[in-house]
């Protein structure tokens, strides 16, 4: 088989149409180019990256399944209440159900396919056919992205690092081929992730001092860096990784590298939340993706207004949300801007409207609003808050309050959160208040080993590996992992 370079057309491939990885690799899809042609110029590399980002943004991955779809359903944030729906089985953690296994398979396969596309870029960067100072920067972007993609997998398919670092991790893929990937322990997987991130940090050190979207829609690859895996996305991902490992000093260090870069990042004012509730989240977006279809897919999923059927997906009950967003203690008297911006009453249930409140709004959205957020600034304050508490509770509370105050709330005091247990419980609530629809709540619940309410608020789900560790797809052994 002639090797092919993955071009933008790959973003149009349907995972459901790919019966096996081997067949996929034996076919040259329409719209691909031979390697020697594809990677004969910088533009060829740029196009390959656009193909990677376009594939990530599809509903099969970050456009839905990895964000407001399957992963947020695991956190009980959303779901259909129809007894026959996959959603009900997902939220019951029935990982042996065929329809749930199909979700897991599609997530796993889709993520590794994107990783293989990144690996193809990296393989060609090892022996380029021309010289350019940009080639090393492209390598940094690709390495950082490979680490980011693996980290999202290990958070779902392996034990939490602090509770099971010597247990089975995931395959870490270094090749375009989807077969014969070495399986590492959790600790070994994290070592590979950090190795890629360290090199990405080194290679991107001289660029990305301004991270923005450049809403003029410039075609320059080196503008609009907020929709590329930029240097500050590397810092933010390292903060996430070190947080997961329990390395508080490093987690705080890298989160602070982001929050200190006020030239690009600043929390919205307490009266300006509307400007950051969705993409492009100006001033708060660290890494996101353009997507022409995201808002339409969102409207189709959340705005059909039919509760109790497969036609509509509802959020937590009003009583659960009122409890989550309740303002108590020293903060009493203020209003959390997020609840009304994210949810509304529809008959007997709550509708999630964070990214669009109607199908018409989704359709009419400007090009600059057509995208999704993957890493945002508030999370960097949450990471600092957790990391600093043991050594400096006052600084930890200040970090937490910066986000709260930007969302319209008054500051909490130490008397509101007198113990570390209380503080961490409040942090979990903040993830749930701030990040619905982004796929970050389930990993946070796992990290904090926290109990949580089911979708309708009828029962409390206790943390366990049987919930937090997804099973590998049944077909995975056929791909030759070792």
Residue ranges and their predicted role:
Residues 49, 115-118, 190, 197, ...:
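Inward-facing hydrophobic residues that define packing positions of alpha-helical scaffold repeats
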Residues 36, 66-79, 159-166, 210-300, ...:
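Short, surface-exposed recognition loops and adjoining beta-strand edges that mediate ligand/DNA contacts
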Residues 47, 228-229, 250-377, 409-410, ...:
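Hydrophobic-face positions in mid-chain alpha helices that act as interaction patches
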Residues 85-157, 184-187, 204, 366-372, ...:
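Conserved, well-structured interaction surfaces
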Residues 1-30:
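Bacterial Sec-dependent N-terminal signal peptides
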Residues 156-192:
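Short coil/linker segments at helix-helix boundaries
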Residues 21-71, 411, 450-482:
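Membrane-proximal, proline-rich intrinsically disordered regions
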Residues 190, 248, 393-394:
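TPR-repeat structural position
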